[in-house]
Amino acid sequence: MKDLTNEEKEQLLKTVGDGVLALSHDDIPYCIPFGFVYIEGIVYLSMFPKGRKWEIVQKNTRVCFTIFSWNEDHTEWSSVVVDGKILPVNDLKEIESVVKANMEKMGLDPTTYLEKRMTMYKKTMDNPSALKIFKIESSQIGGKKMKMLIGS
């Protein structure tokens, strides 16, 4: 097993579509898959403020987010683990950059999607049950890669 370079970690974070958010409260772990975007060292997620994940985040903001990827013939994998704190994003300019990045990742048309999505966020900023964007401010980003030993 080898450490990923910073460039390899960045590349994975920019290209992998989904990851797993790990939460914990009272020594009970909880992991849930999430789509995400990565912008300048920060992982962004969106979630509705309800359910088990929301209850846990209210009590413990320390999280871990993991992504992984196999090469084409499944003989080598790479993973990145982001440790940090999950925090709400309330700045509309930051939200707009997240929406744009998500739009690009999903291949959506910016001329219609961005305006509609930003209108929704502006209208629901003060609604406690509306979809919210969160960011993981990382304390550490680690990465590993491993080649499978075939035939040994």
Predicted regions and their residues:
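A generic structural signal for nonpolar/aromatic side chains embedded in well-ordered alpha-helices
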Residues: 13, 56-57, 102
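Helix-adjacent hinge/juxtasegments
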Residues: 52-60, 64-87
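Short, structured patches in soluble enzyme cores that scaffold and shape functional sites
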Residues: 23-25, 69, 137-140
